[in-house]
Swiss-Prot record:
The alpha subunit is responsible for the aldol cleavage of indoleglycerol phosphate to indole and glyceraldehyde 3-phosphate. It is an enzyme of class 4 (lyase). Pathway: Amino-acid biosynthesis; L-tryptophan biosynthesis; L-tryptophan from chorismate: step 5/5. The active site is at E52, D63. The gene is trpA. It comes from Nocardia farcinica (strain IFM 10152). Keywords: Amino-acid biosynthesis, Aromatic amino acid biosynthesis, Lyase, Tryptophan biosynthesis. The keyword Lyase applies. CDD domains: Tryptophan_synthase_alpha. Its EC number is 4.2.1.20. This is Tryptophan synthase alpha chain. Pfam families: Trp_syntA.
Length: 266
């Protein structure tokens, strides 16, 4: 009855290699559209298993200053919602898996069914929806089922047990575990709340867990890879993208080494 997650093979491969999956992030259109395509390609070639392609949005309430500034630059450069599909196509062509990360408002404006259709046509695996809760996602449930797309919702240390269970039941592909409360951004120390949140998730579900918010180097990636199925890196890669492709390749390679060096929980 239920369709196979597009990302299931990616996580299964990583597990078979005794490592976590490396999940990168970049807004489409940063530093410009061609630059974002080249950057995402470099991420895949340097060890990213999955790339989250961000849809730049004018009111990014959950994003820290690095990602906000990148989104503003992309919007000033004239990026459109549909440009995200060009980036997704490039990631898929490079051999990576692409998911879109978007506030729900741009998807609603584009049209939920139309967005799902165009994302699937571009080879995308699903959507991460940071400000959408399952109770308000009826249109997305229908469209994601029609086009076999993964639904990746967020949970946080503050999520109640009831909220956690509801969100896990609604999710497919992986669950996005925000390891700290508050906005995104690279940090010196990774939150101690993340392992406890992962343990709570595993008490209810065997869905792969991606942990994000704060990773900026290989050592932190290794730390998270010891208890999570996926290590999500956003702000640090966006900062590297501002420096150029060599910086992106170097950081991605370091992170890819990190997720491989950890003693991974089986």
């Amino acid at each position: 009855m239920s369709q196979q997650s597009r990302l299931a093979n990616t996580f299964a491969t990583a597990r078979a290699e005794h490592r976590a999956a490396l999940i990168g992030y970049l807004p489409a259109g940063y530093p410009d559209l061609a630059g974002s395509i080249a950057t995402c390609r470099a991420m895949v070639e340097s060890g990213c298993d999955i790339v989250e392609v961000g849809v730049a949005y004018s009111d990014p309430v959950m994003d820290g200053p690095t990602i906000q500034a990148a989104a503003e630059q992309a919007l000033r450069g004239g990026v459109r919602v549909r440009d995200v599909f060009s980036v997704v196509e490039a990631i898929t062509a490079a051999g990576g898996q692409a998911v879109v990360m978007s506030y729900w408002n741009p998807v609603l404006r584009y049209g939920v069914e139309r967005f799902a259709r165009d994302l699937a046509a571009a080879g995308g695996a699903g959507i991460i929806t940071p400000n959408l809760i399952p109770e308000e996602a009826d249109d997305w449930f229908i469209a994601s089922a029609t086009h076999n797309l993964d639904r990746i919702f967020l949970v946080a240390p503050s999520s109640t047990e009831e909220r956690l269970v509801k969100t896990l039941e609604a999710s497919r592909g992986f669950i996005y575990a925000a390891s700290t409360m508050g906005v995104t951004g690279a940090r010196d120390a990774v939150s101690s709340a993340a392992p406890a949140l992962c343990a709570r998730i595993r008490a209810h579900s065997d869905i792969p867990i991606g942990v994000g918010l704060g990773v900026r180097n290989g050592a932190q990636a290794a730390e998270i890879a010891s208890y999570a199925d996926g290590v999500i890196v956003g702000s640090a890669l966006v900062s590297a993208a501002g420096e150029g492709l060599d910086a992106v390749r170097a950081l991605t390679s370091e992170l890819a080494e990190g997720v491989r060096s950890a003693t991974v929980a089986s």
